[in-house]
């Protein structure tokens, strides 16, 4: 039996989105304090940097949320239930990231974004948070190289 979709803009939706935003901020703050961060190599050419920013800040978050939360989480939910789906997609999302600290951060963010998708019934709120995260990381990388 398919679970009914939640109302997209009702109070429950905005409460779930606000909760996810708070969790996102907490995970990001803890990661900044506890995980040693590597800086990504960014292109020097302004046009290439603009393409990288567009891909990292818009395209990848939308595609990743559609895949991990829209496809993987929903498939796992049908197979094993919502708790296993949340954990499973977070593991897969975390493993898809580079270094061990990135994998740990990816896992934690996968839990937050997956919970957001579960509570709101939509992937776009998570895509918005994911995009904000990637823009913050990109800004940190640029600041780290003195731009």
What are these regions (language model features)?
Residues 2-60, 74-78, 147:
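Juxtamembrane helix-loop-helix connectors linking adjacent transmembrane helices
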Residues 82-97, 131:
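Small-polar-interrupted transmembrane alpha-helices in polytopic inner-membrane proteins
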Residues 62-67, 71-72, 99, 128, ...:
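Active-site His/Glu-centered metal-binding helix of metallohydrolases
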Residues 66-88, 115-122:
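Membrane-interface helix/loop boundary segments of multi-pass membrane proteins
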Residues 14-21, 50-54, 83-88, 103-107, ...:
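Hydrophobic alpha-helical transmembrane segments
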Residues 58-59, 70-80, 94-101:
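Short, amphipathic, aromatic/basic-enriched membrane-interface segments that mark the entry/exit
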Residues 90, 102-147:
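Functionally important transmembrane alpha-helices
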């Amino acid at each position: 039996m398919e679970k009914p979709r939640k109302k997209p803009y009702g109070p429950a939706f905005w409460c779930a989105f606000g909760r996810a935003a708070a969790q996102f901020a907490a995970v990001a703050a803890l990661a900044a304090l506890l995980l040693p961060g590597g800086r990504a190599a960014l292109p020097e050419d302004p046009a290439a940097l603009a393409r990288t920013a567009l891909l990292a800040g818009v395209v990848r978050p939308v595609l990743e949320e559609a895949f991990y939360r829209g496809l993987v989480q929903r498939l796992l939910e049908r197979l094993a239930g919502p708790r296993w789906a949340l954990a499973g997609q977070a593991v897969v999302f975390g493993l898809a990231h580079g270094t061990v600290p990135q994998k740990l951060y990816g896992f934690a963010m996968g839990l937050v974004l997956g919970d957001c998708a579960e509570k709101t019934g939509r992937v776009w709120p998570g895509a918005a948070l994911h995009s904000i995260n990637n823009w913050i990381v990109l800004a940190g990388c640029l600041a780290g190289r003195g731009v």
